[in-house]
Amino acid sequence: MRDDERRAWVEVNLGALKMNAMMLARSAGVPLLPMVKSDAYGLGVAQVVGALESLTPWGYGVATVDEGAELRSLGVKRPILIFTPVLAQDYADIRAHGLTPTFGDEARIRAWQSSGGGDWHLAIDTGMSRAGAPWRLVERLRDVLSSAPPEGAFTHFHSADEENDSFDKQLKRFDVAVSQLPWRPRYLHAENSPALERQTRSRWDLARPGVGLYGVGRGLTIRGDEVLGMATTWPYLPVASLHGRIVDIRDLAEGETCSYGGTWVARGTRRIATVSAGYADGVRRSLSNRGVALVNGVRAAIAGVVTMDMTMLDVTGIDCQIGDVATFLGRQGNEELLIADVAASGGLSPYELLVGLRLRANRVYVDS
């Protein structure tokens, strides 16, 4: 038993990550700008970027100045874009680390230019209503954009994974906004992972995948060759799995309760296994009495409330012993718990479930 697999651990398959990135790049047909914010979605930015570097992405996307500075400390030389609005007090650190900010209002664009300028990208709001210049009002920025032209411009699709008309609306709005710029920036980018899944080639200069890199989504349609013209469906490879070890097994009689609040009550004699992984390790509390884990390839229901350090499973009829592995995300034998399915059972988004893996559990990296 490895020391980092004694209690609870997250296994990160860097080989699967690289394959997902390769397929995303092939599908998009343009260089990638991978999103590695929030410690690479909870999976470890140093190892994730180390794996992605072998695929020569155009650059990386982060959420904060500190995240960008961390990439520079890791030796990353490529462009690093900060996708959340920054304040004037951040400008010195941004320049010190060679980062690229994004702006969507005249005041900050002028402040950036007057304080020394440098590369920046224009954020255009086409419906997310979170940040960026409203698409209808981009024309009002023509004067400042002429004096401080952006290196790039982008938008963000809010519902590309939904079967409605919002994606097409945002596409048209982005096209309209770009047409109002004094001239076309060198780089246009918009597609997140769900947007890339909707089409077989990027419309712009860069593609900006996030969660698809990490194995979450419906997969890609890969273009066929020019002769046959056949397309291939490519499902993402799972990248992350979450495991703990059984540390206690006991039998409960009819009517006995399990965990805080006594919300789980034994109906007949039941066998309960306690696993050394709780919500401080990434087993979300919302999975209490709803989720499952895999024990020796068999699904075992979570019994009662997930606690900070331990989770109890109903293993009645399952052959298991202390020291066996319980899997909360990932595969055992012929059974697999996918991130999207586990998130749905706990009323979570897959993104929320992923970033929760950056908590206490050890990370174990494999390349297969």
Task: Give names to the regions the model predicted.
Residues 2-4, 8-11, 15-19, 29-180, ...:
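Active-site-proximal beta-alpha core segment in soluble small-molecule metabolic enzymes
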Residues 1-21, 26, 31, 67, ...:
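Active-site anion/phosphate-binding pocket segments in diverse small-molecule metabolic enzymes
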